[in-house]
Amino acid sequence: MDTARGVRVELNLDDVVVSNNQQSSRFEATVDGLRSLITYRRFPDRLVLQHTEVPAPLEGKGLAARLTRAALDFARANHLRVVPLCPYVSSFLRRHREYQDLLSPERSSEDSVALKLTSHGHA
């Protein structure tokens, strides 16, 4: 399909491979040459999920949820708490109670975490 003109891409989530690009600190998936991603910062005890990005032709197809699940499953497998600075991830966590146990106590002070990360040059 011609994604350059904004034509929506057909997507089967079962065929989408999400990878953890640790060098770039992001979970990513590429569909029809278009990259979707969630950026993060990893700390010894937590994973700060910063931003989710899905190109317009792929919006509304469940790709952001697929990326979010991959990030949260990674956090669980590595015994990391999650700090969701990204509004999409925060909303996802409110809707999916099965991931509530991953929330960091710092979740309630997202602004202070964001400021701390920014002031230390991590954001």
Please annotate each region the language model reported.
Residues 53-59:
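A short, internal acetyl-CoA/4′-phosphopantetheine-binding micro-motif in the GNAT/acyltransferase core
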Residues 2-37, 42, 46, 56, ...:
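Terminal substrate-recognition subdomain of acyl/acetyltransferases
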Residues 60-71:
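Conserved acetyl-CoA-binding loop-helix of GNAT-fold acetyltransferases
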